């Protein structure tokens, strides 16, 4: 099997690495890729938002399956174009990808499916903003206001704050840009990222993970695309994941089938584990980054065959997933000034050692690897337990040099110390 992976981040590097371990995968292609993925796959620079260009590339490289990593091509309908060309695709249709592309649509689907989530309201007009803010946050007993961009925002469109002025400024800025605003009640509890492989009707959950969205230690500063992750979650009872599967993911998948938009791909549910059980924070239509890096590091089943089964509607016949023992930790090395406009073009030293997955990197004509984005690298390590995996990840990242770079030093710390309780 020849597999074409679409994307250029550490998530795609992790996908390629896991696919390379599948004995049935005989060839790997990536578009556009980065300086690290070039060691695993043929690379092509194409417009990944163009279904026509992706189909042409898939035909040229004789791909048996296309795996779409980022959300934007999915929301734009690239998976539809690939399937229409008769090529197996892992990734939802444009209609099904609305579960991430529009938070209002996701809320509508959850309501129809009877899924537990936060109370919410869409604000389309600045004139309605102040009254809407009065119905959320501390005025009604919530710890914080939760203000979200209804559209795609690369993980950076959310503000959670107890300061009304901060909430209002963020919401007003979104409205001024022409983006609807979603206000939500605050869900109190540790968060979980649960990935589920779905072929339309059959749902197969992967290991739960936890990511770290804020840029600063102690969950401070603005939101990012993700600064680190770990798996599995020693503090999470198995029954919570089972409850999430049967009361959240399966009903949502069934509702999408009912609407004529069956979901075929990776359905990612972000959960808050509250005192009353799991509740949905968000849905995404693709593998999350950096959680993918830790989940796939522990996967012992053949990834290519798993994704192909989902893409061909035969997931029910795949069988039980197998996992390696131990734990995995990913720590993101970010460029100076990230998550604002990052500094780029600096030489990255030590990026070609084992455990380093590339994201915002490119290779100059002289062969030197330089930074090209905000999240530059993901350092991934495994160990017998979370503490061992953390130690190894931080040992590796300590050997990498990039001018002005930064990373969080507390990824997985509370879990390793047994300080997370539900």
From Swiss-Prot:
Keywords: ATP-binding, Ligase, Magnesium, Manganese, Metal-binding, Nucleotide-binding, Purine biosynthesis. GO terms for biological process: 'de novo' IMP biosynthetic process; purine nucleobase biosynthetic process. Residues 107-312 form the ATP-grasp domain. The keyword Magnesium applies. Pathway: Purine metabolism; IMP biosynthesis via de novo pathway; N(1)-(5-phospho-D-ribosyl)glycinamide from 5-phospho-alpha-D-ribose 1-diphosphate: step 2/2. Its cofactor is Mg(2+); Mn(2+). Gene3D superfamilies: 3.40.50.20, ATP-grasp fold, A domain (3.30.1490.20), ATP-grasp fold, B domain (3.30.470.20), Phosphoribosylglycinamide synthetase, C-terminal domain (3.90.600.10). Its EC number is 6.3.4.13. Binds 1 Mg(2+) or Mn(2+) ion per subunit. ATP binds at residues 138-193. InterPro entries: ATP-grasp (IPR011761), ATP_grasp_subdomain_1 (IPR013815), PreATP-grasp_dom_sf (IPR016185), PRibGlycinamid_synth_ATP-grasp (IPR020561), PRibGlycinamide_synth (IPR000115), PRibGlycinamide_synth_C-dom (IPR020560), PRibGlycinamide_synth_C_sf (IPR037123), PRibGlycinamide_synth_CS (IPR020559). GO terms for molecular function: ATP binding; metal ion binding; phosphoribosylamine-glycine ligase activity. Mg(2+) binds at residues 282, 284. It catalyses: 5-phospho-beta-D-ribosylamine + glycine + ATP = N(1)-(5-phospho-beta-D-ribosyl)glycinamide + ADP + phosphate + H(+). The keyword Manganese applies. Belongs to the GARS family. This is Phosphoribosylamine--glycine ligase. The gene is purD.
């Amino acid at each position: 099997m020849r597999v074409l992976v679409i994307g250029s981040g550490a998530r795609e590097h992790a996908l390629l690495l896991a696919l390379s371990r599948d004995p049935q995968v005989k060839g790997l292609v990536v578009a556009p890729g980065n300086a690290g993925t070039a060691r695993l796959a043929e690379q092509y620079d194409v417009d990944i938002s163009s279904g026509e260009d992706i189909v042409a590339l898939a035909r040229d490289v004789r791909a048996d399956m296309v795996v779409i990593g980022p959300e934007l091509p999915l929301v734009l309908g690239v998976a539809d174009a690939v399937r229409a060309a008769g090529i197996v695709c892992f990734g939802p249709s444009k209609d099904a990808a609305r579960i991430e592309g529009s938070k209002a649509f996701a809320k509508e689907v959850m309501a129809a499916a009877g899924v537990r989530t936060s109370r919410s309201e869409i604000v389309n007009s600045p004139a309605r903003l102040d009254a809407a803010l009065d119905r959320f946050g501390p005025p009604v007993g919530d710890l914080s206001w939760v203000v979200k961009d209804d559209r795609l925002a690369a993980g950076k469109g959310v503000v959670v704050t107890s300061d009304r002025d901060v909430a209002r400024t963020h919401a007003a800025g979104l409205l001024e840009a022409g983006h609807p605003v979603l206000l939500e009640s605050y869900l109190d509890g540790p968060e979980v990222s649960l990935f589920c492989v779905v072929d339309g009707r059959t749902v197969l959950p992967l290991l739960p993970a936890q990511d770290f969205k804020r840029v600063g230690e102690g969950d401070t500063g603005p939101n990012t695309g993700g600064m680190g992750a770990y798996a599995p979650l020693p503090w999470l009872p198995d029954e919570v994941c089972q409850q999430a599967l049967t009361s959240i993911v399966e009903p949502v998948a069934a509702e999408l089938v009912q609407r004529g938009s069956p979901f075929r791909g990776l359905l990612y549910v972000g959960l808050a584990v509250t005192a009353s059980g799991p509740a949905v924070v968000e849905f995404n239509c693709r593998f999350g980054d950096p959680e993918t890096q830790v989940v796939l590091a522990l996967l012992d089943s053949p990834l290519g065959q798993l994704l192909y089964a989902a893409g061909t509607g035969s997931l029910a016949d795949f069988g039980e997933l197998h996992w390696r023992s131990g734990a995995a930790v990913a720590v993101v090395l970010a460029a100076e000034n990230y998550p604002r406009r990052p500094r780029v073009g600096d030489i990255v030293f030590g990026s070609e050692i084992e455990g380093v997955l590339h994201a915002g990197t490119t290779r100059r004509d002289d062969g030197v690897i330089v930074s090209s984005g905000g999240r530059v690298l993901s350092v991934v390590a495994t160990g017998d337990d979370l503490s061992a995996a953390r130690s190894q990840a931080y040992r590796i990242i300590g050997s990498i040099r990039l001018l002005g770079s930064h990373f969080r030093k507390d990824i997985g710390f509370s879990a390793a110390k047994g300080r997370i309780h539900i």
